[in-house]
């Protein structure tokens, strides 16, 4: 089955959780974009929500599709955030996010949310994080080389993310270092070690944050929770 169809299926299930009057965090990335479109369909049918976008790209899409947007300064709580993930570890449902370049804002909104609902296709499920790709780490541009060397001392192969021949810039004006650690046995410990490095703004490790993961594959939909995941 086409991956886009799977993403749409997961997005529709997640958006079913949105109720009238909710403040909803809007994730970033190809899967989250489907959720924004599905939510916009419900808004056009009369659903009233306020969206909190996690990137300028998501804000543009949501505005174009007619979703009213707000900010964390205006809203004291976020009822539900719907977002994608690059990898989901079975069991505790720890996540790697940030290949779309919005990990800092995604983590801020997720942390402010009552519930974080992750939508993925089954290819994103792994036994251990780091099995498929790099861990993005957002860093200050000043002295990023020193930050990269500190990450290398933790065991990573580090590459500065580039776009159009220049360093990729996040919405906050930061760089992203893509760090290949290999399989990550203890993500919470690694997250803490990375966060202690001067120059690190945020890592793409989301540990203990997902309320549920909605997984779509050719057999249908499965909803994983940290307590019920295999």
Swiss-Prot record:
Catalytic activity: aldehydo-D-ribose 5-phosphate = D-ribulose 5-phosphate
Keyword Magnesium recorded: no
Keywords assigned: Isomerase
Listed pathway(s): Carbohydrate degradation; pentose phosphate pathway; D-ribose 5-phosphate from D-ribulose 5-phosphate (non-oxidative stage): step 1/1
GO biological process: pentose-phosphate shunt, non-oxidative branch
Matches recorded under Pfam families: Rib_5-P_isom_A (PF06026)
Highest taxon in the source lineage: Bacteria
The protein's assembly and partners: Homodimer.
Family label: Belongs to the ribose 5-phosphate isomerase family.
UniProt-recorded name of the protein: Ribose-5-phosphate isomerase A
